[in-house]
Amino acid sequence: GVPTDVKCRGSPQCIQPCKDAGMRFGKCMNGKCHCTPK
């Protein structure tokens, strides 16, 4: 995935930030959202 600066505690928190970044969905890894490119 693509690392972002969005802090998270769970993967559901990453869905919207990744959409906003033009990507599909994300996982929370090491406290940061990692998004999946389209």
Swiss-Prot record:
It comes from the Eukaryota. It is found in: Secreted. GO terms for molecular function: ion channel inhibitor activity; potassium channel regulator activity; toxin activity. Expressed by the venom gland. GO terms for cellular component: extracellular region. Transmembrane segments: none annotated. Disulfide bonds join 8-28, 14-33, 18-35. This is Potassium channel toxin alpha-KTx 3.11. The lineage of its organism: Eukaryota, Metazoa, Ecdysozoa, Arthropoda, Chelicerata.
